[in-house]
Amino acid sequence: MDFTKKILVVFAFTIMLGISSVHCRPSFKPIPLFGEKLTQCFDTRPCLQGMLKCIEFCSSMGTADGQCNNENLCCCTHE
């Protein structure tokens, strides 16, 4: 009787460990390759005021450069 309780406890812990490892898996974020720059686009508000406002916005975010794209989104480039 005691042996089956131990097996049941080990089985329960194995299931709990399996479930926790599935739920706690870190999200995959691609790392830019050497020389490749990461670009992140934001809303249109800075670009409505001109390219300089987009550059100022991106500088305040701590990025290297900012440009308005064809959709008038302010895109910041990370180095």
UniProtKB/Swiss-Prot annotation:
GO terms for biological process: defense response to fungus; killing of cells of another organism. It is found in: Secreted. GO terms for cellular component: extracellular region. Residues 1-24 form the signal peptide. Its main location: secreted. Disulfide bonds join 41-76, 47-68, 54-74, 58-75. Keywords: Antimicrobial, Disulfide bond, Fungicide, Plant defense, Secreted, Signal. Belongs to the DEFL family. This is Defensin-like protein 109. It comes from Arabidopsis thaliana.
